[in-house]
């Protein structure tokens, strides 16, 4: 595989990984909602603690702001669930270009739709990890040879580049000591 095909394969793998990324984002939102709900339901202070009475001027909107935050997060979760469903359809559309009963398709479905780790895939098939990987790479190559998939890759190259640059930027921000060689 030459450099151009490697880049196209990377874009294709990124496209196939969209369910995982959407599910990961939804999980983050779910965890945030749980954390805010726990804060809302947590007891205040210790034994015998009584908060001072608040003024009724309407400026103390603590409980209301928590409810608004929760409502906003619930709306984001609903939107993210829709994104997960759309991602599943997009990935299934791509995988439809592989032969119906092929091992390549089964491996790709286990990896990208069911989001199984390689260990589970190799046990499910059953094949060694290296054989599963060879079949997976063969599937990627088969997909790269389809005209419609090639057009989809071209349509997604810019989004992939943006995602990749954003990921690299976050990595650089995380470890400034690595940049300076310290």
Language-model region placement:
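Helix-turn-helix DNA-binding module
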Residues: 114-131
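N-terminal interaction/assembly modules
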Residues: 1-97, 141, 145-182
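Short alpha-helical segment immediately N-terminal to, or the first helix within
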Residues: 110-111
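Short, solvent-exposed positions on alpha-helices
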Residues: 105-106, 130
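Short helix-coil-helix linker/hinge
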Residues: 97-105
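Short, contiguous, well-ordered secondary-structure segments
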Residues: 77-81, 120-121, 133
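N-terminal positioning helix adjacent to the helix-turn-helix/winged-helix DNA-binding module
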Residues: 87-90, 103-104, 135
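DNA-recognition helix of helix-turn-helix
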Residues: 126-149
């Amino acid at each position: 595989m030459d450099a151009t095909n490697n880049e196209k394969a990377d874009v294709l793998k990124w496209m196939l990984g969209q369910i995982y990324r959407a599910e990961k984002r939804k999980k983050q939102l779910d965890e945030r909602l749980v954390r805010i709900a726990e804060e809302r339901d947590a007891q205040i202070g210790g034994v015998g603690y009584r908060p001072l009475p608040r003024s009724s001027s309407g400026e103390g909107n603590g409980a209301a702001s928590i409810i608004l935050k929760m409502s906003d997060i619930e709306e984001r979760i609903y939107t993210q669930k829709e994104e997960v469903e759309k991602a599943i359809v997009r990935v299934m559309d791509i995988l439809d270009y592989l032969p119906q009963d092929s091992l390549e398709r089964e491996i790709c479905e286990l990896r990208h739709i069911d989001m199984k780790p390689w260990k589970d895939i190799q046990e499910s098939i059953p094949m060694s990890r290296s054989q599963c990987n060879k079949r997976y790479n063969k599937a990627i190559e088969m997909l790269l040879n389809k005209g419609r998939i090639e057009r989809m890759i071209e349509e997604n190259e810019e989004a992939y580049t943006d995602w990749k640059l954003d990921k690299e930027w976050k990595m650089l921000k995380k470890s400034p000591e690595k940049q300076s060689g310290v």
